[in-house]
Amino acid sequence: MDHLKRQDEKVFAAIEAELGRQRSKIELIASENFVSEAVMEAQGSVLTNKYAEGYPGKRYYGGCEHVDVVEDIARDRVKEIFGAEHVNVQPHSGAQANMAVYFTILEQGDTVLGMNLSHGGHLTHGSPVNFSGVQYNFVEYGVDADSHRINYDDVLAKAKEHKPKLIVAGASAYPRVIDFKRFREIADEVGAYLMVDMAHIAGLVAAGLHPNPVPHAHFVTTTTHKTLRGPRGGMILCEEQFAKQIDKSIFPGIQGGPLMHVIAAKAVAFGEALQDDFKTYAQNIINNANRLAEGLQKEGLTLVSGGTDNHLILIDVRNLEITGKVAEHVLDEVGITVNKNTIPFETASPFVTSGVRIGTAAVTSRGFSLEEMDEIASLIAYTLKNHENEAALEEARKRVEALTSKFPMYPNL
């Protein structure tokens, strides 16, 4: 980054500081990952200069012959990975992908059935502070009070009662496998569309390690980062019958020019996801998550649903007599990055919470394996149990430093 350093020392310094943070801390935020240098090179390419409103072969600007190739590569690779009939890779985010689906099939005030945010859903699945909850009449389903797993009988009962036009499946904090086939059966029984938001699990689906929602859903949305390990962005997969409507909802509906440099980075990441070593990577994510969950439970920590089937673990910290906010802060103080998170049947404020959400996608990209999961479980428990003991926290910091120093990050940057 020699040019940046010469041109803007302040921005350069901030980026260097962030690189230092990523190198020195243990990244456990479930929605984050570390992209390859090839993905970063594509995103930092000259494609950032090109306006390309429209779609390949039908642009509103000249000079799009090369970016057309890039977008076609991205779309074709997604079709190969997931078996989708139609793909739109232009959404700038998962939220915009969800918005485009809603705009395609819903009218203002239509009823939608989505997962309660504190039970593991997402802001765009009907939260009253989000456009989805403002524009549409969302009815919530959730998890069982004892098992903390989706109660499909309850979903069916609510669907029969409220007759939604759309059912939304998928989550941002649900550590168990979702039965997409069952969701489609429920949707068909009440005459609803089914949209699956697979943002968190897309990489696991790509590797064949989680059921694929594409054969069951009318629409599938996802981010391109998280377990898929691409740049930050979104995309939509849908049945061919909705292709023109979805494309129109993205452009000119809610976006103008696509970010072609980001689409190039998406294409590179999709190419990586087609390789055999990506399947190994995804399996290691799950293996690490299971080992970490086991370690946390051995340390006496309480896990929502009692464990995990994917990359994500939700810790209920109430038995430690602390809040999620305190847990996030003290873990960050010793070099472990997590996020506070609501838990099912939450009683605390979303700014405080009773839980912490963690995931293994980023640490697995870094090369951590089962042995490191044992140490991380020990570190988390030790830190939370001694959150007011400065000597203990200093010891935890040294253990984190010893661990991260074994796995250098981005040595060429």
UniProtKB/Swiss-Prot annotation:
Gene3D superfamilies: Aspartate Aminotransferase, domain 1 (3.90.1150.10), Type I PLP-dependent aspartate aminotransferase-like (Major domain) (3.40.640.10)
Residue positions where N6-(pyridoxal phosphate)lysine is found in the record: K226
The enzyme's E.C. designation: 2.1.2.1
Subunit and partners: Homodimer.
Compartments, as annotated in UniProt: Cytoplasm
One GO BP: glycine biosynthetic process from serine
Entry-linked PANTHER family: SERINE HYDROXYMETHYLTRANSFERASE, SERINE HYDROXYMETHYLTRANSFERASE 1
Catalytic activity: (6R)-5,10-methylene-5,6,7,8-tetrahydrofolate + glycine + H2O = (6S)-5,6,7,8-tetrahydrofolate + L-serine
PROSITE patterns referenced in this protein's UniProt entry, alphabetically: SHMT
Molecular-function GO term, any one: pyridoxal phosphate binding
Database matches in HAMAP family: SHMT
Domain of life: Bacteria
UniProt keyword Cytoplasm, yes or no: yes
GO CC terms in record: cytosol
Disulphide-bridged cysteine pairs: none
Pathway: One-carbon metabolism; tetrahydrofolate interconversion; Amino-acid biosynthesis; glycine biosynthesis; glycine from L-serine: step 1/1
Function: Catalyzes the reversible interconversion of serine and glycine with tetrahydrofolate (THF) serving as the one-carbon carrier. This reaction serves as the major source of one-carbon groups required for the biosynthesis of purines, thymidylate, methionine, and other important biomolecules. Also exhibits THF-independent aldolase activity toward beta-hydroxyamino acids, producing glycine and aldehydes, via a retro-aldol mechanism.
Positions with a binding annotation for (6S)-5,6,7,8-tetrahydrofolate: L117, G121, H122, L123, E239, S349, P350, F351
NCBIfam families membership: PRK00011.1
UniProt KW keywords: Amino-acid biosynthesis, Cytoplasm, One-carbon metabolism, Pyridoxal phosphate, Transferase
Site features described as Plays an important role in substrate specificity, chain residue numbers: H225
Name this polypeptide is given: Serine hydroxymethyltransferase
Cofactors that this protein relies on: pyridoxal 5'-phosphate
